[in-house]
Swiss-Prot record:
Protein name in UniProt: Integration host factor subunit alpha
Family listed: Belongs to the bacterial histone-like protein family.
Disulphide bridges: none
Classification via Pfam families: Bac_DNA_binding (PF00216)
InterPro entries named among the record's database cross-references: Hist_DNA-bd, Histone-like_DNA-bd_CS, IHF-like_DNA-bd_dom_sf, IHF_alpha
Any single Gene Ontology cellular-component annotation: cytosol
Keyword Transcription regulation among record annotations: yes
Task of the protein: This protein is one of the two subunits of integration host factor, a specific DNA-binding protein that functions in genetic recombination as well as in transcriptional and translational control.
UniProt keyword terms in alphabetical order: DNA recombination, DNA-binding, Transcription, Transcription regulation, Translation regulation
Annotated stretches, region: Disordered: 49-71
Example of a GO MF term: structural constituent of chromatin
Gene label: ihfA
Length: 98
C-alpha cells in the first residue's frame, strides 16, 4: 500500500479541519514548491525527514538487453533522497504492518 496525495489531503481535512478543497490545494502547493526548488537546482531540506538533492550523472556505456548492442546512456541529472536520522530511526524501530 502506498500513501497518496489524496490520502494526505483527507488526513489534513480530518485532523486540521480544512475544507477538502483547501487540503488538496495545500498538498499540491507543497509538492509544487519542492518541484520548483529542484528545477532551479536547489536542495530541499525537510528537517526531521530528509534531503532531496540533485546529482549529475555522466554519460556511460550501456547495453541493450535484448540485442546485446552497445548503446551510450546519456548524461543526465537525477533527484536523490537521503533520509534524515530521525526518519531512519523511526523506520528501523517501527513494527511491520501486514
Amino acid at each position: 500500500m502506498a500513501l497518496t496525495k489524496a490520502e494526505m489531503s483527507e488526513y489534513l481535512f480530518e485532523k486540521l479541519g480544512l475544507s477538502k478543497r483547501d487540503a488538496k490545494e495545500l498538498v499540491e502547493l507543497f509538492f509544487e514548491e519542492v518541484r520548483r526548488a529542484l528545477e532551479n537546482g536547489e536542495q530541499v531540506k525537510l528537517s526531521g525527514f530528509g534531503n532531496f538533492d540533485l546529482r549529475d550523472k555522466n554519460q556511460r556505456p550501456g547495453r541493450n538487453p535484448k540485442t546485446g548492442e552497445d548503446i551510450p546512456i546519456t548524461a543526465r541529472r537525477v533527484v536523490t533522497f537521503r533520509p534524515g536520522q530521525k526518519l531512519k530511526s523511526r523506520v528501523e524501530n517501527a513494527s511491520p504492518k501486514e
